[in-house]
Amino acid sequence: MKTMDAQEILRCYAQGQRDFSHINLVRVCLSNASLIGAQLIFVDLGGANLTRAQLDSATLKNANLALANMTEVCLIYADLSNADLSGANLVGADLTNADLSGAKLGGADLRKANLSEASLRGADLRGVNLIEANLTNTDFSEADLTGAYISDGAVINVVNLS
């Protein structure tokens, strides 16, 4: 797996490259970075800082984002299917229409996150914090919500829990 640093990935993105699959970006700082539409399949972003990064329509299938700081990250229409977000900080993240099917989110902090229209079908949400999250039309079918915190101001409208 090739390793890149933040400057290198941002330079390549600015030059038009969008496919960064199978790259090692462990603990990289990409806060406030704009990587809209980037292909980050099987990327290792464990412990990375993605605070306020713009990752709309990005593909992060099977990515490792465990323990990543993703506070206020923008992941509208992003594909995070089968990604590992265990213990990630997603406070205030915008995951509107995101695909998180089969994702591992155990212990993740999603307080005040926007998950409207998102798919969490078959996701592992054990112990996840969803306090004050927007869960309008969110698909939780076949998801494991054991020990999840969902009260205290969560917006729940037409949620699929089948």
Swiss-Prot record:
InterPro entries: 5peptide_repeat (IPR001646). Gene3D superfamilies: E3 ubiquitin-protein ligase SopA (2.160.20.80). The keyword Repeat applies. The keyword Repeat applies. Keywords: Repeat. Pfam families: Pentapeptide. This is Uncharacterized protein slr1851. The lineage of its organism: Bacteria, Bacillati, Cyanobacteriota, Cyanophyceae, Synechococcales.
